[in-house]
Amino acid sequence: MKKMAIACALLSSVVASSVWADAVSSLKSRLDKVSSFHATFTQKVTDGSGAAVQEGQGDLWVKRPNLFNWHMTQPDESILVSDGKTLWFYNPFVEQATATWLKDATGNTPFMLIARNQASDWQQYNIKQDGDNFVLTPKASNGNLKQFTINVGRDGTIHQFSAVEQDDQRSAYQLKSQQNGAVDPSKFTFTPPQGVTIDDQRK
């Protein structure tokens, strides 16, 4: 009886591992179908009780694996741009731009996961698939991200994604009008406007 229990436990482990591997493979292969795109997005942030904290909107341009431009236009403008080596964050309101090396950027934020689509990033999560929904939970518990969900079609179109933090704050993003194809290279360059304070952390 004990041997049977051990065998069942081992079998369950193998099946779970296989399901996880299939989910990772499915998610990565779907995202790989679209190498570059533009989409508009809406954002809704709620706190642990479900009360609205912020709503916003903007535009997103991506060319995988390392080029992207995340432009929040409302309620306050902010820009996150990667030229493949440097990651720029610009806040026009405070007139400050921060530069960091992309290779040093954290891979445990939802947007970075989507933009990079690297196997090494996905390995850090337990992933479950339910149709077009993929639910990710970090294997390590020392980060701020509690759960990440992305809905991506078989054709690689991202419909929505959301992130739940440890304090249960939820940020949900709805993508609309995704247009696949070449993106103007200028979208992936950033030159700080004159007079802007630059915090260069590329040391």
Curated annotation (Swiss-Prot):
Task: State the SUPFAM superfamilies in the record.
Answer: Prokaryotic lipoproteins and lipoprotein localization factors
Provide the GO biological process annotations. lipoprotein localization to outer membrane; lipoprotein transport
Q: Which organism is it from?
A: Salmonella paratyphi A (strain ATCC 9150 / SARB42)
Localisation: Periplasm
PANTHER family membership: OUTER-MEMBRANE LIPOPROTEIN CARRIER PROTEIN
* One GO cellular component term: outer membrane-bounded periplasmic space
Keyword list, A-Z: Chaperone, Periplasm, Protein transport, Signal, Transport
Q: Which domain of life is it from?
A: Bacteria
Q: What binding partners and quaternary form does the record give?
A: Monomer.
Q: Where is this region: Disordered?
A: 178-203
Please state what the protein is called.
Answer: Outer-membrane lipoprotein carrier protein
Stated family: Belongs to the LolA family.
